[in-house]
Swiss-Prot record:
GO cellular component: nucleosome; nucleus
Family membership: Belongs to the protamine P1 family.
A Pfam family recorded for this sequence: Protamine_P1
GO biological process: chromosome condensation; sperm DNA condensation
Entry-linked InterPro entries: Protamine_P1
Protein known as: Sperm protamine P1
Keywords noted in UniProt: Chromosome, Developmental protein, Differentiation, DNA condensation, DNA-binding, Nucleosome core, Nucleus, Spermatogenesis
Length: 51
């Protein structure tokens, strides 16, 4: 769940895509975020009700 969420403060689109603003949370997830784009979208689809 929090795996691909390196940029918590940013919007989901920014969180999924590799951005420079993701400095605070620099984990493996941040690096894997490039591939996580699909995963992120997929996960947010299930939570689309919230957003």
């Amino acid at each position: 769940m929090a795996r691909y969420r390196c940029c918590r403060s940013q919007s989901r689109s920014r969180c999924c895509r590799p951005r420079r603003r993701c400095r605070r949370r620099r984990r493996r997830s941040c690096r894997a975020r490039r591939r996580a784009t699909r995963c992120c979208r997929r996960r947010y689809r299930l939570r689309s009700r919230r957003y």
